């Protein structure tokens, strides 16, 4: 009796291996592969300060109008809060609040705000008269109310509305955020970014650059945020949140 047995050719049967053998019928564990080297991520050197200049070294950043409005709301808020801290002796004055709002006021602590052509009212809700009137109503109501005489109490309406918060937080959105988003950033993609607005008069920034910077100016007046500029409004609320967490906070000049 003659017996025959078949012998399968052994080798690497994995087509992904370096030594794949198309003739092999049985894998013998000899497959070899290239070592997988993970890609090396690019490295970036993030400066601690950014300075934006044109080709001639002229500074292209300007947002003084926004800084003025932040200062105005800061002084208005401080005035509103005096009704909470004076033991009932400081009755707010409606004409003071209203004149602070439209900047006909002359009693600013920072006298540079007097008659500087900037105001909060005209920039509220992109000029919506109804929204402006609502803020003026709150100012008048706050002035008509009797200041609290007990420590720890706050000036508020019978329904629980705290006028200082309504006015301060309301203008942070209706003025500052409205201007950022609805005025400056909404159409920035179509702004010119090739030529200076008016270099002869010191406006070395392009239209796009200026609109971006003015939007930033409503966030904070600080050029080294968050090293400074964390004491008020949106700069205060954003501090220690995402920007600081991801380490992207740098100075702007």
Predicted regions and their residues:
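Bacterial Sec-dependent N-terminal signal peptides
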Residues: 2-56
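Mature extracytoplasmic or organellar-lumen-exposed domains after removal of signal/transit peptides
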Residues: 36-253
């Amino acid at each position: 009796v003659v017996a025959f047995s078949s012998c399968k050719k052994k080798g690497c049967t994995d087509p992904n291996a370096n030594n794949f053998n198309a003739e092999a019928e049985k894998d013998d564990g000899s497959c070899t592969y290239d070592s997988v080297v993970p890609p090396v991520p690019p490295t970036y050197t993030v400066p601690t300060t950014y300075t934006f200049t044109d080709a001639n070294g002229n500074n292209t950043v300007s947002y003084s109008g926004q800084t003025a409005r932040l200062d105005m709301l800061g002084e208005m808020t401080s005035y509103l809060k005096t009704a909470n801290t004076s033991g009932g002796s400081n009755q707010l004055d409606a004409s003071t609040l209203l004149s602070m709002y439209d900047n006909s006021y002359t009693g600013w602590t920072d006298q540079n705000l007097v008659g500087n052509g900037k105001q909060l009212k005209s920039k509220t809700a992109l000029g919506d008269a109804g929204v402006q009137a609502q803020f003026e109503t709150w100012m008048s109501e706050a002035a008509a109310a009797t200041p609290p005489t007990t420590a720890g109490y706050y000036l508020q309406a019978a329904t629980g509305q705290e006028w200082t918060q309504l006015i301060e937080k309301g203008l942070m959105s209706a003025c500052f955020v409205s201007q950022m988003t609805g005025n400056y950033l909404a159409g920035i993609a179509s702004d010119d970014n090739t030529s200076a607005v008016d270099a002869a008069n010191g406006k070395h920034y392009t239209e796009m650059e200026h609109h971006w910077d003015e939007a930033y100016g409503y966030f904070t007046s600080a050029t080294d945020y968050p090293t400074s500029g964390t004491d008020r409004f949106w700069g205060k609320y954003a501090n220690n949140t995402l920007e600081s967490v991801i380490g992207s906070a740098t100075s702007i000049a």
